[in-house]
Amino acid sequence: MKKRIKLLVLFVVFSIGPVANAQVHMNFKFETPYGENKAVGKYAEINGAKIYYEEYGKGEPLLLIHGNGGSINSMGNQIDYFKSKYRVIIADSRGQGKSEMKTDSLTYEQITKDWEGLVNHLKLDSISIIGWSDGGIVALEMGISGKTKIKKMVTMGANLRPDSTAVNGWAVKEVGKSKKEVLSKIKQKDTTRNWKVEKQMLDLLGNQPNIPTKDLSKIKAKVLIVAGDEDIIKNKHSLEIYEHIPKAQLCIMPGETHFAPASNPVLFNEIANKFLAEPFKRPDSNWTKWK
């Protein structure tokens, strides 16, 4: 059976039109109704908007941050795996899922402030993060901000800028095409979807982020940069990010795309767990220094 997906280029959600997905099979079905779990779901008033979040498990806090147009359910594969090991905290980012938008111009800076606000709301002393796509961008922004004590973070398919030096050219073109379609819907006063919200999400993809590479040196956390070797984000850009973070490791997943957390969650989760659970190492391959 063909799956309907929404391609906001850096994430997968239901969308403007059906896209046949024959090559990448993703799982978003779980026994627990993640994102709709009334038993654990709560709202917090953060920076003027009601932000919906859920918590699972006990232990050290682990934030899971989803990608553009996604929701809590998007990272159900990670919740399933990590909730037996950590206190998993996951929210619908502003304007997505059950969380309010309350702005006419959404930015990664705003989403970052929201997550920092949620950390303060929950009175968390320190955290670790797994961020996918836009969630990875937010994780990097939180690390640069330095307002939250972050032990470790794993980013999957994150980028510093929206142009073709970082993102594959076909994806840049697709964002432009989708923008035109959304603007047409707004002009037609179509009411089948909230097209103004859709435009804001596409503006995030097309115009942001704009993180100076030099700012990565401010990140004190230990970071694992992950990407698929067939990612939307260019591998050389993932390498660029890795090379400018003081305490970083790099993992290019063979035979995987931007969607590995859902298409190959077993491998992705094992990689992330190994990084989070084991002492950080960045050995020098110069054996003349070995003792």
Task: Put a short name on every predicted segment.
Residues 255-291:
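Catalytic active-site module of serine/aspartate enzymes centered on a nucleophile-bearing elbow/loop
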